[in-house]
Amino acid sequence: MEAKAIARYVRISPRKVRLVVDLIRGKSLEEARNILRYTNKRGAYFVAKVLESAAANAVNNHDMLEDRLYVKAAYVDEGPALKRVLPRARGRADIIKKRTSHITVILGEKHGK
């Protein structure tokens, strides 16, 4: 059995969030929480919210035990980019892409200790 949570259209670059997600993949729920709590990256806040949502889904919807949960899979997909114009010299303009992310965390339950 597995529980899943997704945060879509999060306004942070996928490249930056992947650095954080790579830290928790395969870890136990408690260890992942501790890692995210002390990770000094903006993406850690968003990943922590998705992790807590997945944990709540596991306990409330799938009757899984919280102390047995681990991060089975965690990945970040790219969402649509917001295009913004940056005026430049001589009447030109550059396009700035404000990137968005879809953050997915899947928790599994370990059997036996």
Swiss-Prot record:
What's one Pfam family here?
Ribosomal_L22
Q: Which InterPro entries does the protein's record reference? A: Ribosomal_uL22, Ribosomal_uL22_bac/chlpt-type, Ribosomal_uL22_bac/org-type, Ribosomal_uL22_CS, Ribosomal_uL22_sf
Recorded coiled-coil stretches: none
Gene3D superfamilies tied to this protein: Ribosomal protein L22/L17
Task: Give GO MF terms, alphabetically.
Answer: rRNA binding; structural constituent of ribosome
Gene Ontology biological process terms from the UniProt entry: translation
- Assigned GO CC terms: cytosolic large ribosomal subunit
Keywords (alphabetical) are: Ribonucleoprotein, Ribosomal protein, RNA-binding, rRNA-binding
Classification via SUPFAM superfamilies: Ribosomal protein L22 (SSF54843)
As for family, the record states: Belongs to the universal ribosomal protein uL22 family.
Q: Which PANTHER family does the record associate with it? A: CHLOROPLAST 50S RIBOSOMAL PROTEIN L22-RELATED, LARGE RIBOSOMAL SUBUNIT PROTEIN UL22M
Briefly state the protein's biological role. This protein binds specifically to 23S rRNA; its binding is stimulated by other ribosomal proteins, e.g. L4, L17, and L20. It is important during the early stages of 50S assembly. It makes multiple contacts with different domains of the 23S rRNA in the assembled 50S subunit and ribosome.
UniProt-recorded name of the protein:
Large ribosomal subunit protein uL22
Task: List the source organism.
Answer: Thermus thermophilus (strain ATCC BAA-163 / DSM 7039 / HB27)
